[in-house]
Amino acid sequence: MKLTRAQFLKALPAAALVLAGCTAAPTAPADTDELVFDHAYPLDYATQFTADCYADGSTLLTIPDAQVKFLVRPEGAATLHTVPEGVTVLQQPVQNIYLVSTSAMDLFLHLDALDSIALSGTRAEGWYLDEAKQAMQTGRIAYAGKYSAPDYERILTAECGLAVENTMIYHTPEVKEQLERFGIPVLGERSSY
């Protein structure tokens, strides 16, 4: 089954779409009894990741340079008994995102996905996008600290489903590790590359 561009965009959390830039090395798709590879999604412009589509509607996003793999599972999909090693599962819908990377906000806005963001690493007055600023001023999005000093209590209370960081997070690996210890997947977006 070949997905249309609209279906592909709907199937992925908006955070995964901020990956663009350098060429990604080809990777072998994961195949298990539960995950049956269907096809590699052809990417015309984004080259910093690969997307492998599976028969059950799952998509495996691989970011080779960061050695990161996210398996995006469709809403309502059964829990997998076996997850390939090194793969982080994101169950749709991904909600209560902690968006630290300001450059990614525009993509969320264009995908009409602002409602999936609950937390920001930028204060309201720091936003250059009116929609983000207004969402923070009205309390729809809360400030949860910058990348190097997040408010872990607020992030946990919000039941954060994903932290979208920029590459600065790699300068404070202890923060990334702590978020992951709390069970929060961390995506280091690379749109500035």
Sequence positions of predicted segments:
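Sec-dependent N-terminal signal peptides
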Residues: 11-16
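N-terminal module-boundary/linker segments of secreted carbohydrate-active enzymes
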Residues: 38-45
